[in-house]
Amino acid sequence: MGYGVAQKRAKVTNSIAKVSEKTLNVGANANPAQALAGAVAGVKVDITSGSPSATPSITIRGGSNYDGGSNEPLVIVDGVIRSSLSDINPNDIESMEVMKDAGATALYGARAGNGVIMITTKQGKNGKASVSFNAKVGLNYYNLGYNMCSDEDYLYYYRLALQNCEWTLPGGKYASAYNSNLYGTNNPGGIGRTELSQGQSYNILRKTDDNAYLLQKGWSEMLDPVSDNYILYRNIDPLEMNGRTPYVTQDYNASISGGNDRGRYYASLGLYDADGFIKGTFYKRYNFALTGSYKITKWLESNSVFNYTRSNWLNDDPMLDTGYFMNRGQAFKFVRYRDEDGNDLYGTGGPTTNVNVNNGNFDRDFQADKFSMTQSLTATLLPGLTLKGTMSWYYNEEYDESFNHQYINSQAGAVNPNGNNGVNRSYNTSASFSRYFDQTYNLVANFNRVFAEKHTVNVMAGTEFYKRRYRGFSAGGYGAPTGYFPGLGLTQNDADVQSRSMSSFHNEEALLSYFGRAEYDYMDKYLFAATFRADGYSRLVNNKWGTFPGVSGGWVFSKENFWNKLGMENIINYGKLRASYGMNATINSSYLGYYTLQGSYSAYKYDGVYGYRVSTLPNPNLKWEKTRTAEVGLDLGFLNNRFNLGLTYYNRLTMDKYSALSLPRTTGFSTVTYNNGQYRNAGIEFDLQGTLLRTRDFQWTFNANITYNKNTIVKLPENGLQNNRQGGSEVYTGNGDETHYVGGYQEGQTPGSFVGYGVVKMARSQADIDALGDYIDTGVSNGAAVYANEAGRQRLLAMGYTNLVQLMPGDFIYEDRNGDNWVEAKDRKVLGNLTPKWTGGFNTTLTWKGLSLYARFDMGFDFQVYDSNIAFWLGEGQGAMAFNDAVRDTWTPDNPGAKYPRVVWASQYGTDNYIRTNSFFTQNGSYLACRELQLSYVLPKSICQKLACQGITVSVTGQNLGYIKSCTIPLPDHTTYTSGNTAGWGGTYNVPRTLLFGLNVTF
């Protein structure tokens, strides 16, 4: 329950879920949060990146923010508040509890508005020393998630896409405006280049007798579908240049523990070493933990916990832009990464860069060191009365350093690295250092007694002081005379060239708290608890103090005499009704920065004079963001607790939530943080655990949960607009010219909706177009206007449109919602919502003798996703994108019944079948994901004894094995959302599939 107060499960009157040690340690996870997906009702884990250093996001019961604020719960490890779970070794965790309702989390007051994750690390146990060694080695397989089309198919459809464009390209009808090296310019045949030059960017040529020899050097040929020429081409997969698959993850842990009646100890060492998909990227973490307890006297006990973590990482290559994984599948084929003699070339930049040309040219050193120490003394003053004093220190230091030697940044530099073209010699160098130090001191008294063998009283009271000091600086520069030394002092910095920059920051915050909890139960049947906390927070200037009460109660009706008289005890042996109500707050909000309330300042120079100005507008009157939660629940045990069922209804209201208010530009500020209304999450949680089958040698157990959650914006500040809306789009309701606003944020609406055009059908033939009359469409992404016939064209001209494109067979016909035969922005509608209404998961274990099969799944239902990737590829959004295999099912005169519209080069400048958000690419996002599947075997004791050990377990595990889904996007549990108007799968760093081999030995 927190602050060292233990409580029996049967007496718990709040929503507290415990995560098993097995769940946390089946796979190789850099972050324990990865193992929570689908493990706890009401907890949603978004694993949004396959980067080995990625930090999953955790949301409990829908969170308290919908507009960009943090929904992360409070993380407490051995009494120490942590910023995240990222530096915690899962192998050191003894127990993890998720506190969800305010009746429980009110004890942590101002920081627990999004729930609490409480972790207790392993402690020593009485007995002789036990030594354990655990090793896991995994092979990670990169998964793009789409089947891209073959080289020949790509060229075939790309050339048709050029032929289908209705406008004149700068270089001729069949020439690509993307790059003159690709197809040539001013050439009606479309492919002008016939000679292969060293500096050429693409392996594309028009075949001639002089270059036919390339067919003997790995090139291929095909007939150009729009001319009588043959095309020579050679493709080198960017994966071969920049990536690696499989790539390796290693996880090693060793521990020793033991103890006796006077003292106990536990010590561990851990190494987690994971390569990334991009060559040279990695995440490495070293862990050391030491815990000990010692009875100084009969009435005084000491407990000590020490943890140290060092992390090193490199997340990406400097030459690959941040959009690499978005563009990895989109990148144009046939980039010239290597010449015919096997020499590396540069490529074309961005996602199509060959990182091998710059091996050793970039120095990167990113390192974080984290220490935590907790020391407590517990004194037993009287029977049942204890006094515990605890001090906790948490130190987090990060140092980042970067230096660029001479490096190649174009194809010309790869051809001639000693020349002046395509070579960067600016020798950029930078370094940054940050440090924060958290101190927590608390004193807690606890009284626990049983009176007359019926009345149990447990009272706790305490006070706590928390302080954080955060310091840091950064500096950078360029223009050093040499690339051999990375010193900032060598960079050029004179009156003509100011190449150096530097900054620093100094921040502090403090929290003073008083808290207490009282529990009473009568004969384990009637349960009551009350919690109170008062917090004073330094950042809230005029509203420092907040109070956070919580109450809960329970009735174990299965202990009543009438239950036995009904004869139910043999079926439902345990039954408890519970209810709770409480309040807490959120101060770990991303909106509540160090300078949010008092303002910040920056230097400036005007007319030769230096001064300073306010750069962040302060808001000293900001109030506490409070969360009020009420819940009722029912816990049942069946067949002597062989099966256990839990049902909970919760209703959580976030009041005075933090948000950023946009300000007029005339104020000189972009935003100010303010209290922005009320937000409600309400839902139902179901938990079911049990043993399906048990014999002497065989056992089958399972654990399942599912949650329904609905979130609603209840109240926004009065602004005179409909539903006090913030943002949104005006659209027709479907009732004539009547309009309303959708998207954005509005009272009474659910955030997460996205807006787009409804697709009526695809024009399969000219007859479908002729039936449209004077139909016009001005909803094109880039300002063009579409007409069906001459009457529509004249209509557009009269409206002032000049960039006109005719609707063709193979194009979409969009929904006209007000009946004026004109598709415009107001004809859009809500296409779906990106937030699953139902989430959950289940795991199951089948054990036969020493053999065990374990599987873990999570799921989400009743929501929509938008596949913007296929739309962007087939729409040729930048004029030169790759195609996935859906291109084979696009409309052509020979395939009028195709699923997808015709492919047109740079579709957004034409009829825009693909780039604009529409209902065609809106899909059901429901999914079932297989997170882990493990087969393990415990060797017989007779074999272990011969090997001088107590136990040996070997295992093979598959992680992130895939989804059962109907949508086309690879990760239906990860979508993007912006103000209710746009949606899509952004093409992130996909989570890899992993094959993991494990060994655990205990001595």
Question: PLM ranges: what are they?
Answer:
Residues M1-D275, K279-A289, I296, E301-N303, ...:
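Short, small/polar-rich motifs associated with maturation and membrane association
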Residues N14, E21-N29, N71-L74, R285, ...:
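Extracellular/periplasmic, surface-exposed regions of secreted and cell-surface proteins
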Residues G42, S51, R264-Y266, W848-S868:
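Glycine-rich phosphate/pyrophosphate-binding loops
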Residues V77-V80, M99-A102, R111-G115, V248, ...:
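Short, glycine/acidic-rich beta->alpha junctions
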Residues S132-S227, S474-A475, Y674, L693-V830:
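Conserved small-residue
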Residues N229, S410-A412, A495, Y537, ...:
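Extracytoplasmic gating/loop element in the C-terminal half of outer-membrane beta-barrel translocons
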